[in-house]
A protein has these predicted regions:
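Helical element adjacent to the flavin cofactor pocket in flavoenzyme catalytic cores
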Residues: 1-54
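Long non-globular sequence segments
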Residues: 354-356
Length: 356
């Protein structure tokens, strides 16, 4: 599963249903005023206010920090941060299989085919204490994952075989478990008890992306009494953007190769995986790669860059290469610099257009 892509398409769907998506924005404070929440937000060093009837604190690793710092309140529960890290190496085997490797410490490690050319290996479970804004894989974690692979595969890995890595922290509900791997992965929803006409606060402790819809429905169930006209649950049958009229990646790839002159199969496959049927929105009226604008390399064209900036809130080259396309594994420094220069010009033109 491409977790970053899942988050983006959910944001797209929410936007299409009327939500306002505000990226690169920080909440400075939230206070109760006349039965509603008044939030002060910061975007590009500019402050502004919005009001809300309910506040959902789904800030993950910062759930208790938000309560303490932005709300000036005491959290009702605590969290434990557990670091999980992955490494990416050249594909270990040609078959489309995933492996679950049982280690002698009773943990399991997954090996999953990743982006056709690579294998994704993970994850670790390490207690984390530090700044959740800055999380990196450690040498010990890298060695641990390599050792697990070498215990199970004839092909032996070395640290220099690691092409890339990434690490994150899981914000888990603190159930007083002594081992990081034993901490509950279940979510806990903590609803404030408003007095008089105060607006409610719902804080989400724990949870994971694989059960995000279940968590969201449980959260809305708790909020239903504050919104008597709330509709019934509907997401079980709802398709995410890009799944409309979509049959399979293979069928869509064939359609793209037939419709777009000069398109490489690898790019068609990436588009089909990333955008689904929304790929036609991205392409517009273009029927030839020669009309897709500047080529940044590795199948990334100006047409796609403009689309993810305009429709998917991408701002930086990191947004595009790492969070939208995964092409960071192929781009070198000069290619990334060319994309950065184009984005600077694009943002300048958009600002001038807004000013006009």
């Amino acid at each position: 599963m491409d977790d970053a892509r899942l988050v983006v398409v959910n944001a797209i769907q929410a936007h299409e249903l009327g939500a306002q998506i505000r990226t690169q924005t920080r909440c400075i404070s939230a206070v109760q005023q006349e039965g509603v929440w008044c939030l002060t937000l910061e975007h590009q060093k500019q402050h502004y206010q919005i009001k809300a009837r309910t506040l959902v604190n789904a800030t993950g690793a910062w759930v208790t920090d938000f309560i303490q710092q932005q709300l000036s309140k005491t959290p009702k529960a605590g969290i434990r941060l557990v670091q999980g890290s992955h490494i990416i190496v050249k594909r270990l085997y040609p078959e489309p299989h995933a492996f679950i490797l049982q280690n002698d410490d009773q943990r399991i490690v997954f090996v999953i085919p990743y982006l056709d050319e690579y294998s994704l290996i993970g994850t670790t479970d390490v207690e984390f204490e530090g700044d959740a804004n800055h999380v990196y894989i450690t040498e010990q974690e890298t060695a641990y994952l390599i050792d697990v692979i070498n215990d199970h595969f004839k092909l032996q890995l070395q640290p220099e075989d690691v092409i890339s890595s990434f690490a994150g922290v899981r914000a888990l509900y603190d159930d007083a478990s002594t081992q990081a791997s034993k901490v509950t992965r279940d979510y806990v929803l903590a609803m404030s008890k408003p007095v008089a006409d105060e607006a409610p606060l719902l804080s989400v402790y724990g949870g994971k992306l694989t059960t995000y819809r279940k968590l969201a429905e449980a959260a809305l169930l708790q909020l239903k009494r504050y919104f008597p006209h709330m509709k019934a649950e509907w997401t079980a049958e709802a398709k995410l953007p890009g799944a409309e009229g979509f049959s399979s990646v293979e069928v869509l790839c064939a359609e793209l190769m037939h419709e777009i002159k000069g398109l490489e199969s690898q790019t068609a496959h990436r588009w089909a995986n990333s955008y689904g049927s929304r790929v036609w929105h991205m392409l517009g009226e273009n029927k030839d790669v020669q009309t897709l604008g500047q080529s940044f390399g590795h199948g990334l064209y100006q047409q796609e860059v403009d689309y993810v900036v305009k429709r998917e809130w991408a701002v930086s080259s990191k947004d595009i290469l790492k969070r939208r396309t995964k092409l960071y594994l192929k781009f070198d420094a000069l290619e990334t610099q060319a994309l950065d220069l184009y984005l600077q010009d694009l943002h300048l033109r958009r600002m001038q257009g807004d000013a006009a």
